[in-house]
């Protein structure tokens, strides 16, 4: 699982549970359509799994 992941926030934070918002902030996603690069590791994969319905992930 070496490499990085490009994660893009595709849905807004309004009306979301505080745990979801906290997970997105820990990934660095605070605004709609913002893209961040994170290392491909189990911790990041777990956070992505929790918010999979709101983000788009590209391996790269």
UniProtKB/Swiss-Prot annotation:
GO terms assigned for molecular function: structural constituent of ribosome
Pfam families given in the database record: Ribosomal_L30 (PF00327)
Entry GO terms, CC: cytosolic large ribosomal subunit
Superkingdom as given in the UniProt entry: Bacteria
InterPro entries according to UniProt: Ribo_uL30_ferredoxin-like_sf, Ribosomal_uL30_bac-type, Ribosomal_uL30_ferredoxin-like
GO BP terms in the entry: translation
Record keywords, A-Z: Ribonucleoprotein, Ribosomal protein
Complexes and interactors: Part of the 50S ribosomal subunit.
UniProt record similarity statement: Belongs to the universal ribosomal protein uL30 family.
Protein name stated in the entry: Large ribosomal subunit protein uL30
Naturally occurring in which organism (per UniProt): Symbiobacterium thermophilum (strain DSM 24528 / JCM 14929 / IAM 14863 / T)
């Amino acid at each position: 699982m070496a490499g990085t992941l490009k994660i893009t926030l595709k849905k807004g934070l309004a009306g979301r549970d505080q745990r979801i918002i906290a997970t997105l902030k820990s990934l660095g996603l605070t605004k709609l359509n913002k893209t961040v690069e994170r290392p491909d590791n189990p911790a990041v994969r777990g956070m992505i799994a929790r918010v999979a319905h709101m983000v788009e992930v590209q391996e790269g």
